[in-house]
Amino acid sequence: MALEHAKSFKDLRVYKKAREVSQTVFRVSKTFPKEEMYSLTDQARRAARSVGAQIAEAWGKRRYEKHFVSKLTDADAEQMETQHWVGEALDCGYLSPADAAQLNSGLEEIGRMLNSMIEKADSFCGSPDYVLREDVLEYFTNAPTDD
């Protein structure tokens, strides 16, 4: 399978996987008890959603390798936090072992992909494929001329 260069964070397999896991967390957390709405449910959803958001931010900071790696590290920490909340939900009986295993498998895969990106950060960083710049404008003043 040939690899193509990503033109956007949305093209990254790790980002797509993070979105998939986030949606699964949202779906399964709908069944959590109401009393967990502002604690376990909220925390699990926020952590899961943050994984993809951190990947997107890393992409935006890839011009600077240290910033890129820092954001990917944050994404990895968020996937680990999500694993924690999956474990809490399992322990409380809110998640089936099968759902917990599926989520943890996806999260661990995300962790491996993120760590691979961190190890190969230099291949993602440097000059971006695009340069944003304004057109050269001519500025005139109302100063009187010598004519």
Which residues make up each language-model segment?
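Amphipathic alpha-helical assembly/interaction segments
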Residues: 1-147
